Amino acid sequence: MASHKITLLTGDGIGPEISIVAKKILAALSEKHSITFTIEEKPFGGQAIELTGKPLPEDTLNSCKASDAVLLAAIGDPKYDDLPRDLRPETGLLNLRAGLNLFANIRPIKIRQALISSSSLKSEIIKDVDLVVVRELTGGIYFGQPKGRISTEEAGERAFNTMTYSDYEIDRIAKIAFDLSETRRKKICSIDKANVLEVSQLWRERVIKAQEQYPNIELTHQYVDNAAMQLVREPAQFDVILTSNLFGDIISDEAAMLTGSIGMLPSASLGEDGPGVFEPVHGSAPDIAHKNLANPIAMILSTAMMLRTGLMEYKAATDLENAIDKVLGKGFRTIDLNRDQSNTKLGCREMGDQIIKAINGI
């Protein structure tokens, strides 16, 4: 019997609610597929601030390092916005990524056939969308030095940031994208701004160099402004999108809305070795917390992504994804997906229960 240790970070807002659903689903898959999941819950984000004064306690980080995978629900709350930056929940997430040496964010965007009408775009535009955004996570303008603010008599207040990438940083994220592309349609679109930015010129050079090791992969390039337009005009043209931290932050959120709800989207943050962090794209949604209104499907799909990418439990992952499609195909919806009120509306717990029934063939 396969055995895996998972650190579960339930976090803030709707995090505990969707975590309960994820644990029940793992229990169902454990029984069906003879897999042992040892789940260790640890405080993180605002939850950890309340308990320890820190968003990422050392004990939590150590548990994550000792795990096979980390499953994160959601963090953040406006009540922490006035704290010093290093004590906010979001800084805890940055420190977790740094502590686990995670540099690649993988965000799949797939249109589930039962939800085509939920998208704000026409069905003929989005019906075949199945793409993945591979975003570099630890370099670029968010981390470049120098950065800061200064006051001058001539110009008044002045702020500055530095966008910088090295060969090594580009090469390793490119390898992630090319390896992923080999398991898909063998197409990569690298997004940059090489017409005006030196850092993007280096990015393009290194990505072209990386392709030499993958002659069967079709590589194209788009400037980020054009790519933003193409994602809305013809999103099905994309297979794997490779891009830098800043551009990926923007492009991945735009791509997220192709599905009609951010409550449907999983993601993974990966390094070269060690455990990855698997989490929904959505935030902690404190306005609907504790009301049984949250859509747990992004958390459930993150669990499936963890099973496939982090734990190599391919059959269990496919089983879970098929169960989700089966439930959606029956017309069950959480409130964020029930726009036309023609489907059966479920709460967070009830949606989880229906997916467990589908796993068990009911």
Swiss-Prot record:
GO biological-process terms attached to the record: L-leucine biosynthetic process
EC numbers: 1.1.1.85
Record field: transmembrane: none
Residues under site feature: Important for catalysis: 142, 193
Catalytic activity from the UniProt record: (2R,3S)-3-isopropylmalate + NAD(+) = 4-methyl-2-oxopentanoate + CO2 + NADH
Keyword flag NAD: yes
GO terms, molecular function: 3-isopropylmalate dehydrogenase activity; magnesium ion binding; NAD binding
Matches recorded under PROSITE patterns: IDH_IMDH
Positions of Mg(2+) binding: 225, 249, 253
Cofactor names: Mg(2+); Mn(2+)
Gene Ontology cellular-component annotations: cytosol
Binding positions for NAD(+) per the UniProt entry: 283-295
Gene3D superfamilies found in the cross-reference section: Isopropylmalate Dehydrogenase (3.40.718.10)
SMART domains: Iso_dh
Subcellular location: Cytoplasm
Entry function: Catalyzes the oxidation of 3-carboxy-2-hydroxy-4-methylpentanoate (3-isopropylmalate) to 3-carboxy-4-methyl-2-oxopentanoate. The product decarboxylates to 4-methyl-2 oxopentanoate.
Subunit details: Homodimer.
Family of this protein: Belongs to the isocitrate and isopropylmalate dehydrogenases family. LeuB type 1 subfamily.
Protein name according to UniProt: 3-isopropylmalate dehydrogenase
